[in-house]
Amino acid sequence: MSSFIRWYNSRLAARPLLTQSVTTAFLFATGDVTAQQLVEKRGAQKHDLVRTGRMALYGGFVFGPVATTWFAFLARRVNVRNNKKAEVLARVACDQLGFAPVMIGVFLSSMATMEGKSVKERIDKTWWPALKANWMVWPAVQVINFSLIPLQYRLFFANIIAIGWNSYLSWVNSQ
């Protein structure tokens, strides 16, 4: 395991955006597989590989690059002098009141578009319930993330937690 961590760290140092994006693609796909197999209990024969591919595509080409840039922006621009707790809370507020509502909309719109479905209908039906569910999970996760996790590992940490969240999003999106 330590050789994998050394290798991953070297990739993060050499190509941070690419490494974060590929990692995100893999973990978004993992979330969808989890949704299909553990939540929906589809079995291997009925597994929707195209759906898993859409999740990987979105994770790698949209969410990975955007979230990598977002975490760097927060670290660079949202700072409170001499008050780490206030800084963490400010970052969580920016994340949950700005980034999360937009990115849930981007996710649902992207999925609807890739599926050939109505974006408006998808947003109208699922955006608000998904955002409320987000607020039940992600503020606490982001407090931990912004308090304890070094910047280069924040997306990875969020993506590990997001396996469950992406399972939920994949399931909500498929309803």
Curated annotation (Swiss-Prot):
GO CC list: mitochondrial inner membrane
Keyword Transmembrane helix: yes
Entry membrane topology: Multi-pass membrane protein
Subcellular location: Mitochondrion inner membrane
Pfam families, per database record: Mpv17_PMP22
Ranges annotated as spanning the membrane: 55-75, 92-112, 143-163
Main location: mitochondrion
Keywords per UniProt: Membrane, Mitochondrion, Mitochondrion inner membrane, Transmembrane, Transmembrane helix
Entry function: May be involved in cellular response to stress. Required to maintain mitochondrial DNA (mtDNA) integrity and stability.
Family: Belongs to the peroxisomal membrane protein PXMP2/4 family.
Listed name of the protein: Protein SYM1
